[in-house]
Amino acid sequence: MTVFDIPIAELNGRADLLSRHRGRTLLIVNVASRCALAGQYAGLETLAHRHREDGLSVIAVPCNQFGEQEPGTAEEIADFCSARQISFPFTEKTDVNGADRHPLYTALTPFADAEGHTGDVRWNFEKFLVSPAGTCVGRFGPTVDPQDPELLRAVRAQVQ
C-alpha cells in the first residue's frame, strides 16, 4: 500500500484525491488559515506553479488541532483560498494527530525530519515529501519555508 492508495476527500467532497495524483511527487502540508505561518501559502503556491509541469502536486490538509487556527467550514476555507488565488488542492478538514489521526498521517509521521523527529506533527505547516512511488522521502518542520534551499533540493531530486 502506498500513500496514493489512502482514501481522503477533497475539500469539496470529491473522493480519492491522492489516487488522482498517482505517479506524481507530492508535498503534503497541514495548513491553517489563521496561523502566523499562513504567509507560507504564497511560497507553496510559487512552488506548486513552478514545478507543476515537472510532476509536483502540493496537497494542503486543513487541520484545526493546533490552537484552533482552522475553525472554518469547507466553504469558508474555499473562500479563503479563492481570495488568495491558491490553486493547489485541499483535502477535507483532517486530524493529523491523536486517536482520530487520519490514515494518511499514520503513514507519514514515522518518517524522520532532519533533526530526527518522528511521530506527531508538531504544528501547522509541517511538510511531507512523497515520491512518485508513493513513499515518504522527506519531512520538513513547520518553520521551514517552502523556498528553503534544502526543501527545494529534495523536491527537484524527486521531480527530475
Residues of each region from the PLM?
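Rossmann-fold NAD(P)H-dependent dehydrogenase/reductase core
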Residues: 1-3, 8-12, 36-37, 99
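A short beta-strand-turn-helix
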Residues: 5-25, 46-51
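Conserved helix-turn-beta segment immediately C-terminal to the redox Cys motif
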Residues: 24-25, 34, 38-62, 82-85
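Hydrophobic adenine-recognition pocket in adenosine-nucleotide-binding enzymes
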Residues: 31
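Thiol-based oxidoreductase modules, predominantly thioredoxin-like and allied folds used
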Residues: 55-72, 87-98
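Short, internal strand/loop/helix patches
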Residues: 75-124
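Thiol-/selenol-based redox modules, centered on thioredoxin-like
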Residues: 106, 110-160
